[in-house]
Amino acid sequence: VLVFIETDNGLIGVGEGWTPGASPKALMQTIEEDVGPRLIGQDPRYHTKIFTEVWKTTALNARRGILSIALSAVDLALWDLVGKALQAPVYQLLGAFTDQVPCYASAGLYGKGKDETALAEEMQGYLAQGFSDVKMKVGGVSLEEDVKRVRAVRDAIGPKARLMVDANYTLNVPKSLKMAQAFEPYEIYWLEAPVSPDDVSGQAKVNALSPIPVCGNETETGIDRFRELITHRAVEFVQFDIAACGGISEGRRIADLAAAFHLPCTLHASSTGI
């Protein structure tokens, strides 16, 4: 869902809300009825104040779901407005640590009739397009078949490119550990979302015992959930989506928390390109 916020001088900020498994119509209604009215008459330069006030007024509501996504979309639009008003990109407003970031291609999906050769050619193609690394799906077929898929991709992309795997929360602890051990020879950079996002203790066990570090969890919202993942050492790579976690404002807090525990962050990206 895209959000457009217009100021009285005609500037328009654009934000995005990620709705995995949820109705875009429900998100639109939440933005229009619960969040949007609180923005009328506000100064977008005070976006942190706006975010905090709206967050506080939702203390009795379900923050982890669609409301957090609505706040994310609005927060992104407010940051965009401020950048346009100051004629500066948002990365400069955040301190301009760097003006470029490495990008990997998240692909390698399962498909009818898609064998290892087709998968390998697909992943090679992303490197040819300029992506530095690639990520592929696992956990949707037998472990033996997944090993063949991973081996084919590693052989195709060579030893220098990073290869990540994403199980999309489909495994349990024993299966996750068995998979990690089977994938170890192929130098997997991270194992993403191995178990249910509700099983923090299980994910912590996987992270502690797996030869491949765990990455997660892009479906979480708000710093409190990420604090639980981090303090339980359930992740080695902290992954959040600014179109769901609470926007740039909350994402920055999550990144600062991860830094305090010496954990790197990686951003999950929504699909519109905005």
Go through each PLM region and give its residues.
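N-terminal small/glycine-rich loop or linker at the start of catalytic domains
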Residues: N9, P89-G111, R149, A156-R162
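Catalytic domains of carbohydrate-active enzymes, especially glycoside hydrolases
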Residues: E122-K137
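Active-site beta->alpha loop and helix N-cap motifs at the rims of alpha/beta catalytic domains
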Residues: A107-A120, L143
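Catalytic core of soluble alpha/beta enzymes
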Residues: M136, V141-S271
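Metal- or metallocofactor-binding catalytic centers and their adjacent structured scaffolds
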Residues: E6-A85
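Short, charged beta->alpha transition segments
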Residues: P89-L93, A118-G125
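Short, Gly/Pro- and small/polar-rich lid/capping loops
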Residues: V1-F4
